[in-house]
Structures are given as C-alpha cells and as structure tokens.
C-alpha cells in the first residue's frame, strides 16, 4: 500500500531540502512484481493481487483507482517471452470483474524491433535492446492485435 501514498499531501527531506507536495489524486500504481529476501521474483498481476489493490483503494476511499500492470520484470520472472501470457491473464481478470475493469487502465510490455537483448560492447544489431530483453516487433504486433480483439 506504500505506492498509494502519492495521492496524499506529503512532507519529506530530499538531499537536505524540506519538500512538501500537494498530493496527486490521479496517481496510479505500477504493478511490476517484486523480489523476496531470497532473490525470487514474486509476481503481483494475478486476479487476487489486483483485487487486493482494489480493496486498498476502496478502504482509503480514493476517488480515481488506477493501476498499470508491467508484464515483464519480476512479473515475468525476467522471462520476456512470458509477456503475452501475462497480458492475457490480466485481460481475463478484467473481463470477469467490473471492479478490475475500473482499476486496470493498461499494461506495459517491453518490446523493440528485434527480439532479445545484446551487450553494449562490440558489434550491435540495429533495433535490439542493450538493456532488458524485449519482444520483437512481430510478437509485439500480434500481442497488440490480440489485446484489441479481447478488450
């Protein structure tokens, strides 16, 4: 629930400065999973996770519940090819719950022109990530079209 704090007025120290915010009633949660104390990726995109977030929004009586699910990172256990399956599950959850249709505003996928990733040193392939592995363009296009059909 720490992520929901941005909707409220805050006061904190930042690099020696006393900072006060007005809060942001339009703030949203980004669900990218997490890592436990053993280094294991722990996803948070499942139906139960989304419903728990919805309940936290309701308990705090927040006006604009909003979440975006990151289909990669810890939600995919850093296995980028799992992104289409994760997006499909999120869409399935939205179809079966009016609350989740209100809550989940979108998904994030990591994609680039070429699939995978490459080291920054040496010869590089144009359009291939030098950071996280990504879906290639064809898989991304297919995923977007499938999402449009299911939405």
What are these regions (language model features)?
Residues 75-87, 117-122:
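Short glycine/threonine-rich loop-to-helix capping motif typified by GTGT followed
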Residues 9-20, 46-62, 90-96:
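Structured alpha-helical segments in the cores of large, soluble enzyme domains
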Residues 90-116:
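Substrate-binding cleft of secreted/luminal carbohydrate-active enzymes
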Residues 1-8:
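Short, small-residue-biased leader/transition segments that mark boundaries at the very start
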Residues 18, 23-40:
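Positively charged, amphipathic and often flexible ligand-engagement surfaces
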Residues 32-36, 72-76, 107-114:
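Active-site beta-loop-alpha junctions enriched in small/polar residues
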Residues 69, 136:
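Conserved, mostly hydrophobic/aromatic
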